[in-house]
Each structure stands twice: as C-alpha cells, then as structure tokens.
Amino acid sequence: MTFESVEWGDPRAVALRAAMDVETTAMYASRAAGQTPEQDAAVSAALTIDPPTIVHTVLVIDDGRPVGHAALRPWGDELEVKKVFIDESVRGRGLSRALMLELERVALERGIHSLVLQTGDRQIAAIALYESLGYEPIEVYGAYTAIPFALCYRKSL
C-alpha cells in the first residue's frame, strides 16, 4: 500500500468519489425522502466542494489499484478533511487509519496543527475510526448546520 498525491480532477480520484457518493446516497436515502426541496438544496450546497479550495488530494494505491481517497481544504487556520473513502473490497485492513494518519502528516508538514471534519450519523465505521484516532466531537459548523444528521470532529495534532 502506498499513497499518491494527485490533483482533485484526477480520473481515479473522480471515480472513487463517485463510488463514495453512490454508497452515501443509498445510506441516507430514507432521510432524503422526507426532506423538503429547500432542505434538499441546503444539504446539497453544504456537501458541494469547490475544487479550487482543495489543497491536497491523496489516493491509496494497493497492488497497483486506487482503492482509497481523501482530501484537505482550508477551514480558517485549520484544514478540513474531505471525502475519506476506502473501496469496499479492501476494507478491514487498516487502510482508512493509514490514510487519516497520512492526512495528519501532510497537515503538520504544512504547518497546520488542527484538523476538522464532518461525517454523518449513519457512518458508524467512520465515526469509530475518527474517535479511535483522537478526534473529538465539536459543534456542527459552517454550512453543515443545514444537515440534521451531521456530526463534526476536531483533532489537535
């Protein structure tokens, strides 16, 4: 397993984000069914990423194949972790933990000493991972306040 820094628009990164979107859309479909069009629009806006804001995108490469993805973007004087995803076929091997530690390394290399992130309450494995790595729950921030099931975390590095 290795890490490869890529541009946000790298086709392999785009494909992994698309797979993540399919998975999370299915995970939260029952919640979306009960929302108003205005709520849908607010959630969509909160989850939309403006590509020029991304300062680092990394892939997990396993046996020559891209199997994981994550990115960082500025959030005040911190960096925000975005789009952490490991392909289902390789889960359970510690790749997500290694990926998060790589993001922490990159942040420190950039002189950043705190990471924040947002996840959803149905992403139980992600929540367990973040908490096991020392991320602490914080108040829901920014546009994520429009997402009723949002959970936010911070870790001082």
Outline where the language-model segments fall:
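Short acidic, gly/pro-rich beta-turn/loop elements at beta-sheet edges
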Residues: A70, R91, I127
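Acetyl-CoA-dependent GNAT
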Residues: E4-K82, D87-E88, M100-E102, V106, ...
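Active-site acidic-Proline motif in GNAT/NAT acetyltransferases
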Residues: D87-R93, D121
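Residues forming the Rossmann-fold NAD(P)(H) cofactor-binding site
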Residues: R93, R97, L101
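C-terminal "cap" of GNAT-fold acetyltransferases
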Residues: W8-G9, V14, A19, E23, ...
